[in-house]
Amino acid sequence: MVKTIAIASGKGGVGKTSLAVNCSVQLSMTGKKVALLDADFGMANSHILLDKKVEKTVNDLLENQLDIESVLHETSSGLKLIPGGSGVLELLNLDHQKRYEIIRALDPLRDEIDILVVDTPAGASDASIEFSAACDAVMIVLVPEPTSFMDAYAFIKALNMEKKFNNVSVVVNLVENETAAKKSFASFKKIVTKFLNIDLEYAGWLPESKTIAGSIVSRKPAILKKSLEPVLSKNFSDIANYMANVKVTKTGGIKFFNK
């Protein structure tokens, strides 16, 4: 059975897409069959981080009725990318029916992959909530700033209230060390559990890194760089391992692969 994991964030600029790309590549390198759906439709940029020129995108699924195999782009690590399309106005405001069509379009991959990673749009938009709720688990990325906490809480609240979804974990990005990361997580969890019936899990942390910043410019995932700091290598590996073994809880509503 395919495990599906959404990578989300309450706001942009916290490292969500970088985490989604690097952990997807890491999972692929461990032998898992992984597909990455860039669901930030119209503003998608996962293909840039992977240095992959794409001709077919999700827009071709919708407008040209192509099948999912026609828009898959395999990378050097074995990761299969489903690009969301960038600069396509029609993708910026997809309605519920179009989002449903995309979710169902992935059904043929059921027997071809082990894990589907979904890079959702930042914030608590209808698209972000719907694609997150269609997954088995959601991993939210935040940074130790009040605005990030507030926006991440708003996202989790919307996900819980609208979709009754509570399988959520947290990655703390841009922190000095694990002690600081766990302190930030504990503070955030205290806020969430005070108002919502959700038992957040800690999934890992990442430090601020010139390697990650440079990887965006060089269009090569940080996890593939020889200059990758040992702490980053370990942390990406730990987070990817968490993703591979994340608990799956049954919820109602529309799900990837008709679960």
Positions of the model-derived regions?
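Conserved catalytic-core segment of NTP-binding enzymes
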Residues: 121-204, 214
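Hydrophobic residues in beta-strands of the RecA-like P-loop NTPase core, especially within AAA+ ATPase
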Residues: 36-37, 118, 172
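P-loop/Walker-type NTP enzyme "switch/lid" segment
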Residues: 37-111, 214-218
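Hydrophobic anchor at the start of a short beta-strand
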Residues: 33-34, 116, 138, 168
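Beta-strand-loop-alpha "switch" segments that mediate conformational coupling across diverse proteins
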Residues: 196-223, 236
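NTP-binding/hydrolysis catalytic cores, primarily Walker-type P-loop NTPases
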Residues: 217-259
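Walker A/P-loop phosphate-binding motif and the immediately C-terminal alpha-helix
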Residues: 2-40
